[in-house]
Amino acid sequence: MSFSSEVKEELVKKTDSARHCQIAEFAAFMGMSGNVSETDNGELCLEFVTENELSVEKFSDLLLRIFSIKMDADTNEMVKNGKETIIRITRQSDVAKILQTLKWCDDRFTQIEPVFVDARIVAMDCCKKAFIRGAFMERGSISDPNKFYHYEIVCKYEEDADILMDMLRFFGLDAKVIVRKNSFVVYMKEGNNITDTLNLMGAVVSQMNLYNVMILKGISNDVNRKVNCETANLNKTIEAAVKQIKDIELIRDTVGLDSLSDSLMQVALLRLENPDMSLQGLGELLDPQVGKSGVNHRLRKIGEKADELRQSMGISV
């Protein structure tokens, strides 16, 4: 099962006790995938069309909780059409209740105007969270966090995407909108934003699972950075040792190591005998012992001597 499916499996079991939050979540399902049409006899009909079985389960549950509407009644139906499931509400008393609850009609039931969401329905913070949950359940997805972080909800219209983006930003989340083919996608790519969104939707188990992945990836990245740093330092050490040996060999083969002072010659001989030894190791072999900085100072003096010889011989330094 994908991580996105795991999140939705958790959310389908999440039910707010407050009726106003239930209405907000129901409004999200209708705003994302609902519409108003007319039957052959001219009566109004509400349809909810989805390819998501979990959305069907949650939508049916909300119909029952909010409006006491069951889908086994003769005048309301649920049909399969290929991958799609169509929930059709045709009983006029049920249609009226839903339209009025969603604020899709006036008080006299004379003017029908479906909207993505009426501002009054999501006025409270808890209702905004419920709406975001419903929108994600119906048209959202989250990538496998082991690969990359990406949260999105696909909207039909730009104004709908802007409303949803503003809701997420209300909670301090860095949501943005992009155009993809004929859709408008509300998305986030930062791990902490996604964990916070999972929390506000009520998917706390999925939030913890994502945290665990982020921690493990962070540890892995830290290890890689440390290895890269140590490799870079090792390369510098090797390059320095090669340069030191070339300097010493030049002096030995031209003017002789005995041209050096006793302290420099002692370090030079030890370096030739121990080409891969650290400066600290070389210092411990000296008599008397010398610290790392002392060895580095002597090798630098040897390098200066070698550069002087190169210049006198017309060799580029």
From Swiss-Prot:
This is Probable cell division protein WhiA. Gene3D superfamilies: Homing endonucleases. Belongs to the WhiA family. The keyword DNA-binding applies. Keywords: Cell cycle, Cell division, DNA-binding. SUPFAM superfamilies: Homing endonucleases. One of its GO terms (biological process) is regulation of sporulation. It comes from Lachnospira eligens (strain ATCC 27750 / DSM 3376 / VPI C15-48 / C15-B4). Involved in cell division and chromosome segregation. InterPro entries: Homing_endonucl, Sporu_reg_WhiA_N_dom, Sporulation_regulator_WhiA, Sporulation_regulator_WhiA_C, WhiA_LAGLIDADG_dom. GO terms for molecular function: DNA binding. It comes from the Bacteria. Residues 278-311 bind DNA.
